[in-house]
Amino acid sequence: MPCQSFFPFCKEMLDRYEHDERIAMIAGFNEDEVTPDCEDSYFFTSVFSIWGWASWRRVVDKWEGDYAFLRDKQAMQRLQSLVKQRGYRKDFIPMCRDHAHSGKEFYESIFWASMLLNSSLAIMPSRNLINNLGLSADSTHFAGSMKTTPKAYRRIFTMKRHELEFPLKHPKYVVENVDFKERLYKTNAWGHPLIKMSRSLEELLLNLRYGNFSGIFK
């Protein structure tokens, strides 16, 4: 669910960066809620959510819905080295393989792979503009119950929206905010095994507390 300023924000970004090949997408969901180290209206990042986004035809034309890059030996060598060197999610390439084997097109992996293979960045608003209302047992990407979801993940689905102020304040340089990436990875326990263990334990205890035994043995 977007707030009202999401639409004029996307329109201005689409116009401003229409021909800038460095930029591949405009995000709306900011896991910081309000990014503490950003004095501008938005910043640039290599990590993003597809919960509310906009892009251009030039970007979509580069997508490989059949995951052809997985069959390109040189591209995979480059991609594996990039993921390792920049500390991206270790499960990214296995996730792409799983998605390819499913026979379905998953936008999150197709989009992110395209961005990495083309050295692109996403525009992230400094304030969260999107609510995700899709946490339930029938959800496509995050199935479960709100009450048995660990607190850090529950926060993501209950996060407030904040309107952006106009006119927008544009950043002077196109450079990635790597601190945002580190915070997002910590929140999601990517590359943080101890945090992941604690979240799994929290989920186990919540399932026991609410008698959701099917969630324990799934």
What are these regions (language model features)?
Residues P2-K218:
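An acidic/histidine-cluster motif and surrounding catalytic segment
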